[in-house]
């Protein structure tokens, strides 16, 4: 069964990015898409797709987009429930922002940009909490890890 982010919504103005992430069994290949929807006739359509070899650290060529506007794979940057429950997430996390705060530029490791602000956050920016940020003791193990 294939489910698209955004459910059955097919209106690009209101549905969000509608990503679909698929790991092809037996091939070690990840497929990711952007603005994916199912037509009335049952056909799946995507505005763009990208394939990733999960056995390689190779990046897309500079200026190439992917299912993600930054040109990066999404799946490896997502929080996994098992990591959060263990209290540690040993990799970078993918976060998203409204277009209005994203710069129309990118920095490594990103390969592409799609923002519309000249002074915003560049695609690929590495962000972190200030060292002075106090993690509330009442937060769950998962919330603290994230």
Features from the language model and the residues they span:
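A surface/extracellular/periplasmic glyco- and lipid-processing/surface-interacting theme
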Residues: 2-146
């Amino acid at each position: 069964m294939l489910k698209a982010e955004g459910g059955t919504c097919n209106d690009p103005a209101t549905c969000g990015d509608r990503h679909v992430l698929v790991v092809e069994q037996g091939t070690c290949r990840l497929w990711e898409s952007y603005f994916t929807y199912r037509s009335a006739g049952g056909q799946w359509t995507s505005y763009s797709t990208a394939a990733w070899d999960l056995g390689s650290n190779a990046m897309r060529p500079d200026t190439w987009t992917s299912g993600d506007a930054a040109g990066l794979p999404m799946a490896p940057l997502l929080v996994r429930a098992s990591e959060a429950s263990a209290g540690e997430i040993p990799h970078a996390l993918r976060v998203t922002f409204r277009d209005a705060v994203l710069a129309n530029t990118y920095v490594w490791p990103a390969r592409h940009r799609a923002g519309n602000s000249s002074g915003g956050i560049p695609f690929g920016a590495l962000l972190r909490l200030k060292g002075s940020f106090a993690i509330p003791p009442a937060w769950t193990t998962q919330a603290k890890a994230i």
